[in-house]
A protein has these predicted regions:
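Conserved alpha/beta enzyme-core scaffold
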Residues: 1-492
């Protein structure tokens, strides 16, 4: 069906990509990310550097790609600029050293910013596809991300045709691209499982300059075995949601959930699945991870909408082997739709995300360790946190065996403000911040979420801090962080 295009090896296709090109990769997490071109681009960079020639690309993605892909590009010094999110230890190190420029963005806004031309032209898009048609129809795989926008905006397109994927994966896709202001229509999604688009992206077939065949699974990893800390946080989340149902603030049929990625979120999903008082529910999220597949099988989750399937190869094979069951229960959308503020607000999504650090007034830091070193990025947490019906942030109360408190007087970096964070939950308890003044919020967070070994310090800070509506002692507000830098422990 796609024989009209030039077949190339990955190394041959990498020759198309020139120094300083803006390159856009498909995928959202490892799902749907290119498998062959990252290594080939790294190889080309090494060859050019050995020849004393400059070679670096500027790299746009949907969210993260596989850490291995970012690692190999980083090791080859092949990237000069990166956006909007990453999870690679090697790339993270270079970003924090200033060797790579990084732009941390709300994921729902990336496609729009590209369409507005804020980043310049996309020279080459590298897109994983499950199938092509001669008229330029491109069927994507397990991670939609920003691939539709990349396909439409790029000057040249390299397709990685991945034969690993079942052709029926296209049945999961719902591709719709919003118009441009001031004539942008509403997105007519009124139910988590509504479909409003097509199963493919239509582009000018002349833009496709190479097709590289692969047969490789996504690099999805099984998460670590649950620990007691994660399980206690999950229990507290379920307790809170049941209380909300009892008070009539969550309807009997429940509300759609958004859940981030990681061990805490996986534990929460497992506990929701086990609790008989939680009714079957839907998800309107950005990522579907391992636990969701099981809950779809059992019927606890009746339908799930997201931008990617970030799951193990075994779970993906289970879906492919049972597409008659799963095709009507999973929808994969572009991230400007999965993370769309209009839809999140309309559906009344309950957002469950993890933070690095919270201050006593309810601000949250989810990106920068000690305020300076990037961890991964804000990702989609801000899209959901700002617009959700209930915005819940979760974290352990301490890290590094108590040397670090997650609750501090003032966040060293703020990603989510006190005006949007509604609930904070640690293994210690639940801080419901709705309707509370700043000082009430502070006492609630300290009493319910801070670890006992830090509560006295935080209460003393609050009592001694001068102020009016908000109390802060700017001479001592970062003493915990200073102690950590000086001694390796916040308590010194």
């Amino acid at each position: 069906m796609e024989t009209q295009w030039t077949r190339m090896t990955a190394n041959e296709a990498a020759e198309i990509i020139q120094h300083n090109d803006m390159v856009a990769f498909s995928g959202f997490t490892p799902a749907g990310s290119p498998k062959a071109l990252p290594t080939a681009i790294a190889r080309r960079a090494n060859e050019q550097h050995e020849a004393k020639k400059p070679y670096q690309i500027r790299l746009l993605t949907g969210a993260s790609i596989s850490a291995a892909a970012d690692d190999v590009l980083s090791d080859a010094d092949a990237v000069s600029w990166r956006a909007p999110y990453q999870t690679s230890s090697g790339l993270r190190k270079k970003i924090n050293q200033g060797a790579v420029s990084f732009v941390d963005l709300h994921l729902s806004e990336v496609a729009q910013m590209v369409n507005y031309g804020f980043f310049g032209d996309i020279d080459v898009a590298v897109i994983e596809a499950s199938a092509l048609a001669p008229d330029g129809q491109v069927w994507l795989t397990c991670g939609i991300g920003n691939a539709p926008t990349w396909l439409l905006r790029a000057k040249k397109v390299i397709i990685e045709l991945n034969n690993y994927h079942d052709p029926r994966v296209a049945e999961l896709a719902d591709i719709v691209i919003p118009g441009a202001p001031p004539r942008r229509n509403s997105v007519s999604i009124f139910h988590a499982m509504d479909r409003v688009g097509t199963r493919y992206v239509q582009i000018d077939p002349k833009k496709i300059v190479a097709v590289v065949e692969t047969n490789l699974p996504d690099a999805g990893n099984m998460l670590d075995k649950q620990n007691p800390m994660c399980q206690q946080i999950a229990d507290n989340v379920v307790t809170f949601l049941l209380q909300e149902m009892a008070h009539g603030r969550i309807p009997p049929e429940f509300l759609p959930l958004q859940s981030g990625v990681g061990n805490i979120n996986n534990a929460v999903m497992a506990r929701l699945g086990e609790n008989p008082e939680i009714p079957p529910f839907m998800m309107y999220s950005e990522v579907l991870q391992e636990s969701v597949v099981h809950l779809l099988e059992t019927g606890k989750i009746s339908g799930a909408s997201a931008s990617s399937l970030t799951i193990s190869a075994d779970s993906l094979r289970k879906i492919y082997d049972n597409m008659d069951y799963f095709a009507s229960r999973i929808v994969l959308r572009p991230q400007e739709i999965s993370n769309n503020p209009e839809i999140i607000r309309r559906l009344g999504v309950i957002a469950l995300n993890v933070g690095l650090e919270f201050d006593i007034y309810g601000h949250a830091n989810s990106t920068h360790v000690a305020g300076v070193d990037l961890m991964n990025g804000i990702g989609g947490s801000g899209d959901f946190e700002r617009n959700a019906y209930l915005s819940i942030f979760m974290a352990p109360s301490i890290a590094k065996e108590g040397k670090i408190s997650t609750v501090v007087p003032m966040c060293s970096h703020v990603d989510h403000s006190e005006h949007s964070v509604k609930v904070i939950i640690t293994e210690q308890g639940i801080a419901d911040l709705r309707g509370l003044s700043p000082l009430q919020r502070a006492r609630t967070i300290i009493d319910n979420c801070a670890h006992p070994m830090y509560r006295d310090y935080l209460h003393r800070y609050l009592e001694n801090a001068p102020g009016g509506h908000i109390h802060h002692d700017l001479s001592h507000v970062f003493d915990l962080h200073r102690n950590l830098i000086a001694t390796g422990s916040m308590l010194g």
